[in-house]
From Swiss-Prot:
GO terms for cellular component: cell outer membrane. One of its GO terms (biological process) is acylglycerol catabolic process. This is Lipase 1. PROSITE patterns: PROKAR_LIPOPROTEIN. Keywords: Cell outer membrane, Hydrolase, Lipid degradation, Lipid metabolism, Lipoprotein, Membrane, Palmitate, Signal. It comes from the Bacteria. It is a lipid-anchor. The lineage of its organism: Bacteria, Pseudomonadati, Pseudomonadota, Gammaproteobacteria, Moraxellales. Residues 69-296 form the AB hydrolase-1 domain. Its EC number is 3.1.1.3. It is an enzyme of class 3 (hydrolase). Active at temperatures close to 0 degree Celsius. It catalyses: a triacylglycerol + H2O = a diacylglycerol + a fatty acid + H(+).
Length: 317
């Protein structure tokens, strides 16, 4: 049980900051071994694609190539391993789980555009290269949700369903009290010290899994190293409103599942009301005592909700 808890904790911490060459080599090596163990359990293989820009996009893919493709998009500060554990419960689908440009093992150019439309274009290039750009199901958490909306709005005839998990981009709903007054200088999502990381870890989740402080310190150093790029990306995404684009999803009646943690301190849970207004066909599920990352905090329930949603779609065909 202790090993399982440590595996889970190390997995989430890596998913929040990516692989690292931080000073604590023993902690890093141990965590990377755990991550690889979890990827293997989920039948995930790590691959990469060189984009037309010359940048590298790294992604995880499971072995179920006969299943319907499901693109899963992580949020700010995360990477593909946000979905590694839940991936084994979604094994019935052909999973494509990328590191967005600027995160994880993908390239991190300072000069790039990191808004939803630019990331959407890169993801479409990836899917085209794999021959999966049509009949695709798309899901995303936080920033990944905004990118999912942008993708579906651009390619509405190709997207068969949409899964929004505590989605960013619906900014007219306002911000939670916990972030009122936050700036690029004092934002809890931007890490400038070990202590910032410790606070962020508890802030993002309502019931964060246990993680040894020594391991937290290792990952804090990686976030500190990337703080300038993180600040640039955050500055771009907080002004990237996808509400107008979401209206296209309503027009095309793309089946949409909206999932939210009722204890989310990053994006107001009341945002679901705005999304439901813009996308009337959306099914909304509010998860009790869950924070900003349901697929990590409550992966069983999150997976069950999604599979039930997909089962309904199958029955309607």
């Amino acid at each position: 049980m202790l090993l399982k808890r440590l595996c889970f904790a190390a997995l989430f911490s890596l998913s929040m900051v990516g692989c690292t060459n931080a000073p604590n080599a023993l902690a890093v090596n141990t965590t990377q071994k755990i991550i690889q163990y979890e990827r293997n359990k989920s039948d995930l293989e790590i691959k990469s694609l060189t984009l037309a820009s010359g940048d590298k996009m790294v992604y995880a893919e499971n072995g179920n190539v006969a299943g319907e493709p499901l693109l899963l998009i992580h949020g700010f500060g995360g990477n593909k391993d946000n979905f590694t554990r839940i991936a084994r419960q979604l094994e019935g689908y052909h999973l494509i789980i990328p590191d967005l440009l600027g995160f994880g093992e993908s390239s991190k150019p300072m000069s790039a555009d990191y808004r939803s439309e630019a990331q959407r274009t890169r993801l479409h290039e990836l899917l085209q290269a794999k021959g999966l750009a049509s009949n695709i199901h798309v899901g995303g958490n936080s920033m990944g949700g905004a990118i999912s909306v942008a993708y579906a709005a651009k390619y509405p005839k190709d997207v068969k369903s949409l899964w929004l998990v505590d989605s960013a981009g619906f900014w007219s709903a306002g911000i939670p009290k916990s972030l009122e007054g936050a700036t690029l200088e004092n934002n809890p999502l931007l890490i400038k010290s070990n202590e910032d990381f410790y606070k962020m870890y508890d802030f993002v989740m309502y019931k964060p899994p246990y993680l040894p402080k020594s391991v937290k310190a290792v990952f804090a150093q990686e976030r500190i190293k990337n703080k300038e790029l993180d600040a640039k990306i955050l500055e771009q995404i907080v002004t990237d409103n996808v509400e107008e684009r979401a209206k296209i999803i309503a027009q095309y009646k793309i089946p949409t599942l909206v999932v939210w943690g009722d204890k989310d301190q990053i994006i107001k849970p009341e945002t679901v009301n705005l999304i439901k207004k813009i996308i009337p066909q959306a099914q909304v599920i509010m998860m009790e005592d869950v924070g900003h990352v349901p697929m990590v905090e409550a992966l069983d329930e999150t997976a069950d909700n999604y599979k039930a949603f997909r089962s309904i779609l199958e029955a309607q065909r």
